[in-house]
């Protein structure tokens, strides 16, 4: 119950201190995001990567700062609960007319849950449900930039309109030939529109801020004609001579889904009203959850908040039980899922059998490495949670026993909230998008019969994509470590993505070697490794026996990716990275690129990133 009167004098001051903490966080977050434009203009690629990594840490730093301030100035942990009721009410008042209220709610939750006992983690004390609407938020500042701009071209001046749209981005670097690039865009658009009649509402809406990631800047918008909307994005890159060019045009929901994939690094976007950007992006990608859009924009904590709300909603309206995930069980991670929910839940086992030589802390470090690194569309993002409570009745007994056997330190079953309901509390877990494990996908091809063209084509595509995934990770200085098929998954769009991170390494930390010649006949026929192997030694020519036991798989692999078995491939990329050269891995097929220019890039065969 909320109090009828706000009579605690310190309640407003605490609420104001928390809001000050959030405002400081978002001011710094937005400033760092806005600087991405200058880094792009000056081709500061290493600075861009460094900023993308460092910005991930901003949120937790600001939360800790705020907690320290509340403890020091207000002894917040000792306050009675009726004061915390009032603090939340004052905070709601401070969110009225705020431009980022949903982010401010999440910040309040993060601070409060570090101070209060878990029994108070419900809607009386934190924002389990949103308290302030994010619809139709607008800035009243006369100098504020609108969320998006609308343009009203005709067929006759479409070219001039495209030029004007790009010029409004105000990039402080010359284009190679903007009229030429605009011509390519118009030609592609006219091919999509065909002979369709342009209706009276024909317009182009474009988000005001560019989306920056690595070496690319992306202009995102949609074409509206009658009742139809066509999402699009224009990738802007540096050409070989340093001037800018439009590299391609992406059309439709699927292209935009690839651009905003959960397997890519987060964008840097200067947003005053992030909810308005998310609302616009959802009109382009209606199947993409808002949680994933906030995460793609670098607002990962908001993504976690929305994901958890979606998860609780799904639990309320489903009845199936959590189970051990199908597939080959891992030696490091215990994986379970809810069949009706498109995600998997992964927790680290307490002990690892040989030959695994790692620790819980090292595994967590690997997952953090992936979180902070450029995932190039080939490594699944993860949501990390602690002390997550699930209804006991939704867990199968088999799953409970599996967790108790392999990760007893990670599970507690109790009525911690005191409401009479037993809960399964998992101490620490990761959540990832569910994909079909690649080994299962290949087995389905075998079961269908490779004499059938569709099965053979699916196998060829999967094996080709597997090699492409490895090569894209190589381009980003990542060696996957355990390259078995079961550690890769295939998405609904047919992309192959890596998701097992416990053996991942920087490519530059690996020592790529050839297998030495046998010393004697016994060495030659031995099935064992007889030569000395260091902790970071990798022997690419030994990959074949582990990966290519099936003749059809081997044929497809050797046709497209035989170089992965050659030490020279790996060593050359290691040396290239050590020399400071960053390859480009873009989120669209190389066939989509305008052929008038080709900036230096790393394109895998059949690239579909």
From Swiss-Prot:
<dbReference type="GO" id="GO:0006006">
    <property type="term" value="P:glucose metabolic process"/>
</dbReference>
<dbReference type="GO" id="GO:0004674">
    <property type="term" value="F:protein serine/threonine kinase activity"/>
</dbReference>
<dbReference type="GO" id="GO:0005737">
    <property type="term" value="C:cytoplasm"/>
</dbReference>
<dbReference type="GO" id="GO:0008772">
    <property type="term" value="F:[isocitrate dehydrogenase (NADP+)] kinase activity"/>
</dbReference>
<keyword id="KW-0378">Hydrolase</keyword>
<dbReference type="Pfam" id="PF20423">
    <property type="entry name" value="AceK_regulatory"/>
</dbReference>
<dbReference type="InterPro" id="IPR046854">
    <property type="entry name" value="AceK_regulatory"/>
</dbReference>
<feature type="binding site">
    <location>
        <position position="346"/>
    </location>
    <ligand>
        <name>ATP</name>
    </ligand>
</feature>
<dbReference type="GO" id="GO:0016208">
    <property type="term" value="F:AMP binding"/>
</dbReference>
<dbReference type="InterPro" id="IPR046855">
    <property type="entry name" value="AceK_kinase"/>
</dbReference>
<keyword id="KW-0067">ATP-binding</keyword>
<dbReference type="GO" id="GO:0004721">
    <property type="term" value="F:phosphoprotein phosphatase activity"/>
</dbReference>
<keyword id="KW-0547">Nucleotide-binding</keyword>
<protein>
    <recommendedName>
        <fullName>Isocitrate dehydrogenase kinase/phosphatase</fullName>
        <ecNumber>2.7.11.5</ecNumber>
        <ecNumber>3.1.3.-</ecNumber>
    </recommendedName>
</protein>
<keyword id="KW-0963">Cytoplasm</keyword>
<keyword id="KW-0816">Tricarboxylic acid cycle</keyword>
<feature type="binding site">
    <location>
        <begin position="325"/>
        <end position="331"/>
    </location>
    <ligand>
        <name>ATP</name>
    </ligand>
</feature>
<keyword id="KW-0723">Serine/threonine-protein kinase</keyword>
<dbReference type="GO" id="GO:0006099">
    <property type="term" value="P:tricarboxylic acid cycle"/>
</dbReference>
<keyword id="KW-0904">Protein phosphatase</keyword>
<feature type="active site">
    <location>
        <position position="381"/>
    </location>
</feature>
<keyword id="KW-0329">Glyoxylate bypass</keyword>
<dbReference type="Pfam" id="PF06315">
    <property type="entry name" value="AceK_kinase"/>
</dbReference>
<comment type="function">
    <text>Bifunctional enzyme which can phosphorylate or dephosphorylate isocitrate dehydrogenase (IDH) on a specific serine residue. This is a regulatory mechanism which enables bacteria to bypass the Krebs cycle via the glyoxylate shunt in response to the source of carbon. When bacteria are grown on glucose, IDH is fully active and unphosphorylated, but when grown on acetate or ethanol, the activity of IDH declines drastically concomitant with its phosphorylation.</text>
</comment>
<comment type="similarity">
    <text>Belongs to the AceK family.</text>
</comment>
<dbReference type="InterPro" id="IPR010452">
    <property type="entry name" value="Isocitrate_DH_AceK"/>
</dbReference>
<keyword id="KW-0418">Kinase</keyword>
<dbReference type="GO" id="GO:0005524">
    <property type="term" value="F:ATP binding"/>
</dbReference>
<keyword id="KW-0808">Transferase</keyword>
<dbReference type="GO" id="GO:0006097">
    <property type="term" value="P:glyoxylate cycle"/>
</dbReference>
